Amino acid sequence: SCVRSGRAATRIKELLERTGLEKTVMLTRMTGDVCRLDYNPLKPAGAEENHNARREVLTFLRRAGLEISGESLTGPFAGAITHFHSADFRQEGGPYSAYTPVPLVPMVLHGKVTYAADVDRRYGECLSILYGCTCSEEWTAATPLRHITDRFYLVALPWSRLAAKPMLAWRRSDTTQTIIFGESDYVQADLERESYRVVVGGYTIARDCVTTCPVGRRRMAVYSKYGAPLRLKLPPGWPETGEIRALLLREDGQHEEQRLKSRDGHLEMEAPEGRPIILSA
């Protein structure tokens, strides 16, 4: 085979020299078809041999210092590759669409790999947060900044607070699903109502397109997809009553500063549509 003869290592070395690849590479055809066969009569190869050879190629690339991501999430390559750009978690139209969706694959792979998925857009941010399909999209120069900002503050930031916690249980009651990460850490979503809630340490960090996520000691990111008046219960450690500094971030990288007042552990403020705010005390 190419691996045993040393040709694979030579080709990879040539590839790196000619392309200048560094840091990372995405392989589009490496992982999708697990049971690939080679019917070449001169050098036939079965599924196991083919799979093992591909894993050797991945080893060569890692030794060259490259972080590898794959296209399609498949079990045999989970771990050999740590990020996949496509996982099939369709709610309708898939091979199991007649059955009740259960987040079995996310619970098995959570903490081992990251992945994205083409989720049903009818469910907004709910499904991405519930199943952890939060980790990649294809953005180009034509991608609206507002879309990127929505994805970061509404999905990626809240999920980052759960990514390192183990998935412990899944529960369903009527149309509401809950994934439990700890005694006071969970995601709860009702897909039909496009309603969700993310709770970490007993504190709600995201709810129905509004994010109120602590990002450090006495610092919080606030973001509203549609704009809304908010009455926030401040996290533990914040002053019950006092001055709160609010930085309204702008597209040009600058900010506008406001001074707000907290009272009795709560803060009333107006969150503008699609405008990140950083609070500090």
Predicted regions and their residues:
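Short helix- or helix-capping micro-motifs
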Residues: 28
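Active-site-proximal substrate-binding groove within the catalytic cores of carbohydrate-active enzymes
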Residues: 2-22, 31-276
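Short beta-strand-to-coil "C-cap" segments at the C-terminal boundary of structured domains/repeats
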Residues: 279-281
